[in-house]
């Protein structure tokens, strides 16, 4: 049998979402929460055309790296810290796609976040040179806009170096950057795509094709047996810490079917009593993650898929303490199992 909600579903729904004039923000009552749990700050993701201001934030990506300020701590760039040339170019159509140099992404409270429309490593390096030149000019004129030491950092490294709010903002901006970067031309006719003026969508003026942001559904599974949880480690990824069974939902497949298939493929186990826990936006990989717990049906003997995993082992509940990073759904599910044991399956 499949239970869609836990017995605390009423509390879950009450605590998950609040909507106001088309915006939403995630509210979590109690607990440290995950990357998106930034209340009382409000996240507004509705698509709008907005004018940038000095206090707003601008992101410059190059592949999987983000340009940051790095002095005593890592921080992001304000609009006022970027070159005057950039600000001027926001007032006109500056590239062959009819796009302005700055693309509005979203806001958190009253701060707006923008993407600098740069798609290649060479373009990104030129922008950095511009900012260095601008910094020298400011210092010579004794203007108090020193942008500090610029550095490229991988987007995933921000999980351990910035606040939860900043990590969420950067991951969500990266999600949109990847989508804009990868959808400059129409996949149907090959013509240039133009950003729509009313919604977040790229439109082809030639054939009418409409391209929306990519969101890939995936599951995280806490497999439980005899008050133990199945912990894994990936075989071919940079991330080397403990994880849970995870995988993408395939065409024509429900999330619950994904749970059964992924567990069988990766560790050779059958599961039952599948219980939904929570979901999480995960901009690092353009995912919407859905968390489930499931009980082993039959034997607990593991058959490891070595192409996917380097390790899979049963870990007793008392040994799962202290694994919550207050960022990821996976880590919160580990902490939830430590706190509640097999009650997670109720």
Feature locations, PLM:
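Short, Lys/Arg-enriched N-terminal segments with co-localized hydrophobic residues
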Residues: 1, 13-33
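Active-site-adjacent beta-strand/loop module that shapes the phosphate/pyrophosphate-binding cleft
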Residues: 280-302
